[in-house]
Every structure is written in structure tokens, then in C-alpha cells.
Regions:
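Gly/Pro-rich hinge or "lid" segments in bacterial periplasmic/extracellular proteins
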Residues: 70-75, 79-83, 89-93, 97-176
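Surface-exposed intrinsically disordered loops and tails
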Residues: 1, 17, 42-83, 127-135, ...
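A generic local secondary-structure boundary/capping motif
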Residues: 84-85, 262
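Long alpha-helical, hydrophobic tracts
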Residues: 1-2, 115, 126, 274
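Alpha-helical scaffolds flanking conserved acidic
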Residues: 2, 95, 257
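Extracytoplasmic/periplasmic ligand-capture domains
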Residues: 5-42, 138, 143-275
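RNase H-like, two-metal
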Residues: 1-9, 86-87
Length: 278
């Protein structure tokens, strides 16, 4: 299956101060994809979907792993020469080739494994610097810029002055996302009017819904499941602590009936009932 994406021609990269740094083109998607599939640069983060859904991606990853530190010098051009199924015929066209039929690939390509990355920024920060970049050093191309980031506390956003859709949408002048370690604390912050929206724990939701006079009943909104799927990733060549093959496990997991036992008896309706109690 071949998927062709046509990109906008009016997207710019800006820094944390809103200053335009460079123009975004299809090359940035090639640079970003090579980074993700390079074992040395990316350290294997978020490689599963590209490995499974793009021709040659898994082989390229294995190649970079074999190269070790030498993989640091590879570029997107090396990835293309290796035969990975992604190409950019022009500045605003991106083509992916899947090993099998993948009618949902457009949703796969929206995942962060396929995000663009500016080559100039990587060259400026270096591999270690890009891997560790924060809100002050990264570049942006979306509707907002992260003005302030306090680890484990808050993320504050302001509008990107060069956002391509600025004239077509309404944006907050500034908004802050509070990171919560305990959702009960989140409920308290909501009650104190310090938050505009919060997810509720099941116990809190039960307390509210069991009391028809509770004032928060009128403020409840249904929480719809997000787009996701479950999967099992099995190790078919497990070793014991001494390095010898675990013959019992390897023989069992090779059996289809054994693998099916992991999910055949799953009953997910109680889970969904709790996830969407309203």
C-alpha cells in the first residue's frame, strides 16, 4: 500500500520567542523519521509503529544498531539509500510505502513517531542536545508556543504569532495545563476554581451521581474513550538468567492456542463501564 500526503506550503518553524527560524517542508519529515529509526540517536523510543507499517524501517533500525556510534553520522539520505519506504518527490509531497495493506495508515502517520524535525535545529543543538531539548530550545510549528514549563507542575502556552491558521481559528491568549500526581487533588483545585476542567476518580464520580442534590451533577460531561488499541508483545526467544534459552517458555509461546489464551477470556465491558460511568 502506498500513501501520498500533500503538505501545506505556508508552515514555518519558530523559536520560543516566536521568531521565524526556517520554512517547514517534506524534508523535515524525512529528517524526523530518520531520527526515530536511528538506534543511536533515538534510543528506540516509539519505533513499533514505523517498524510494522513502513517498508524497510525495521531493517534500517537493525542496521543502525549494528553500526553503534557510527550511526550518529547517518542522515535521511542514507535512510533513503537503504531502501526505507518513505520519500519526498517535492517540498510539499510525502509518500510512504507499507509492507501490507494498511487502510488506517493516515491515523498512524499522525502519531509522534512520524513528526517532522528541523535539520537546522538538530545541527545547532547536536544529537544529545536535541534529545534533551526543552521548551526554550525546541522549535514550534503549531498554534501555540510553550512559554513556561515547570517539571511536574505546569505547562503554560501562548499563541504562535506565525501559525498558518491564525486567521481561521480562535485561540486563548494564554492557558496553563496543571500536571497532577493525584486526581483527588485535581478535584480540590476544580472546587477552588483553580482549574476549568478535570477528570474524576470513580469514587468521586460515584459520590456526585449518588446525590441528586450535589451541585456538580449539572457540570458532569461524558468522557469518551480515546483512539487506541491494545496489543501483546511476546518474546519468542527468551533466555534464562544464565543466558541459556528458556525452552519451556519459547516452546509454549510458539503455540498459537497458548497465545490466544491471553485474550480469549478477556471481558472488557466492566472496564468500559468504569471508564465511562456516566
Amino acid at each position: 500500500t502506498v500513501w501520498t500526503f500533500h503538505l501545506r506550503d505556508d508552515v514555518d518553524w519558530v523559536d520560543v520567542n516566536g521568531e521565524v527560524k526556517t520554512h517547514l517542508t517534506s524534508k523535515d519529515f524525512l529528517v524526523g523519521f530518520e531520527w526515530v529509526m536511528n538506534s543511536y540517536k533515538n534510543e528506540a523510543n516509539n519505533t513499533t509503529m514505523p517498524n510494522d507499517n513502513v517498508v524497510g524501517a525495521a531493517d534500517y533500525y537493525a542496521h543502525t544498531k549494528e553500526l553503534g556510534d557510527a550511526a550518529a553520522d547517518l542522515t535521511y539520505e542514507d535512510m533513503l539509500s537503504f531502501g526505507v519506504g518513505v520519500e519526498a518527490p517535492d517540498d510539499y509531497t510525502l509518500v510512504f510505502t507499507c509492507p501490507n495493506s494498511c487502510p488506517y495508515f493516515d491515523t498512524v502517520a499522525a502519531y509522534n513517531s512520524f513528526y517532522p524535525a528541523a535539520e537546522d535545529l538538530i545541527n545547532e543543538l547536536g544529537i544529545e542536545g536535541f534529545r534533551a531539548c526543552d521548551n526554550t530550545t525546541m522549535w514550534y510549528c503549531g498554534p501555540y508556543i510553550v512559554e513556561e514549563y515547570i517539571q511536574g507542575n505546569t505547562k503554560s502556552y501562548i499563541p504562535n504569532p506565525s501559525y498558518y491558521g491564525a486567521n481561521d481559528v480562535s485561540r486563548f491568549e494564554r492557558f496553563t495545563v496543571t500536571m497532577l500526581s493525584d486526581m483527588n487533588i485535581g478535584y480540590q483545585l476544580y472546587q477552588n476554581r483553580e482549574l476549568d476542567e478535570v477528570d474524576l476518580m470513580e469514587s468521586t464520580l460515584t459520590t456526585i451521581t449518588n446525590d441528586p442534590n450535589n451541585g456538580y451533577n449539572s457540570q458532569l460531561c461524558e468522557k469518551r474513550p480515546k483512539k487506541f488499541s491494545y496489543c501483546f508483545l511476546f518474546n519468542y526467544a527468551r533466555n534464562n538468567a544464565d543466558g541459556t534459552p528458556d525452552e519451556n517458555w519459547n516452546k509454549a509461546i510458539a503455540n498459537k492456542a497458548f497465545r490466544q489464551c491471553f485474550y480469549k477470556n478477556l471481558e472488557l465491558r466492566p472496564f468500559y463501564a468504569r471508564y465511562n460511568k456516566i
